[in-house]
Amino acid sequence: MAIQEELEATKQQFCAELSQVNSSKDLFDLKVRYLGKKGLFRCFADKLRECPADQKALMGASINDCKTYIENLIRDKNHAILLAEEAAEFLREKIDITLPGEPHCPGGKHIVKKVLDDVVDIFVHLGFCVREAPNIESEENNFSLLNFEEDHPARQMHDTFYLDPKTVLRTHTSNVQVRELRKGQPPIKVVAPGLCFRNEDISARSHVIFHQVEAFYLDRYVTLSDLTAMLTEFYHTFFEREIELRLRHSYFPFVEPGIEVDVSCECRQAGCSLCKHTGWLEVAGAGMIHPQVLRNSGFDPEIYTGYAVGMGIERLAMLQHGISDIRLFCENDLRFLQQFS
């Protein structure tokens, strides 16, 4: 059979097979079978080499014309297949507008985040600047510079998460105090919100992770009266009612004197379940910055004095909203969270 006849037969065979192709994969396989390196057109190249010299130009042109014809058919078929596949995809993804809609509840702030923001805003209005520090802290900043003795129980692994012998997950936001005192100049008035971590048993009253806000003020002539006045204003604003403040002597390594801060309960001393029938709510630990902490930060305690107060945000949220179990804040139960959104 002459090459011209073979080319014509190849065209007809290709068109017949092309009419049966309905997918991109089948079209690719057909293209490889005809135009690939080992395809049918390879035999025409071999025959062209054996063709007499005076016929090679004509035969070569005929082979190229046939190849171009097939390539054009493949291109057109590919375009048609793509359009069909897109149309099918559109049908699969088509939205049935007759179906009932699914309600989407709007998000809201977590109750802990809301209380944290409220607390920080109050301190900012009282003239404090917001500062933060890493959750991963050196043992020196978390303990030593805050006047914790080497044998203090808080340094033990059963109370603190150690990442290595000299690095811990901070147990309080007082590490901000150390960092700010060492790099700032009085007056220094800072509020420091953040996460804290303690190796404790999880119960209704305690958790291994919690939020704390520390506020401290350093300058000349800062006194315990300044601390009391600030706390009274803060809790009056936070609880949105008139409150009485009660200070009880306590011990914290980084303050002297150290105090526990109580505010009067809404029951007005009548006694209720919230205050455990005492008439008072324990809300914070505070005191005057310890002279050794000031020395560790490069300040002369004979010249400068300051106060510091630390409060747990979950504790405040529990008191503000009558929540009895701290674990509820971490359980992501929408029935609980939606009450505050």
Curated annotation (Swiss-Prot):
Question: InterPro entries of this UniProt entry?
Answer: aa-tRNA-synth_II, aa-tRNA-synth_II/BPL/LPL, Phe-tRNA-synth_IIc_asu, Phe-tRNA_ligase_II_N, Phe_tRNA_ligase_alpha1_bac, Phenylalanyl-tRNA_Synthase, tRNA-bd_arm
**Which cofactors are required for activity?**
Mg(2+)
What reaction does this enzyme carry out catalytically?
tRNA(Phe) + L-phenylalanine + ATP = L-phenylalanyl-tRNA(Phe) + AMP + diphosphate + H(+)
The residues forming the signal peptide are none
What keywords is this UniProt entry annotated with?
Aminoacyl-tRNA synthetase, ATP-binding, Cytoplasm, Ligase, Magnesium, Metal-binding, Nucleotide-binding, Protein biosynthesis
Q: Which GO terms describe its cellular component?
A: cytoplasm
Which GO BP annotation is one of this protein's?
phenylalanyl-tRNA aminoacylation
EC code(s) of this entry:
6.1.1.20
The family database entries (PANTHER family) matched by this protein are listed as: PHENYLALANINE--TRNA LIGASE, MITOCHONDRIAL, PHENYLALANYL-TRNA SYNTHETASE
Assembly: Tetramer of two alpha and two beta subunits.
Entries under HAMAP family matching the protein: Phe_tRNA_synth_alpha1 (MF_00281)
Family label: Belongs to the class-II aminoacyl-tRNA synthetase family. Phe-tRNA synthetase alpha subunit type 1 subfamily.
Q: What is this protein called?
A: Phenylalanine--tRNA ligase alpha subunit
- Which gene specifies this protein's sequence? pheS
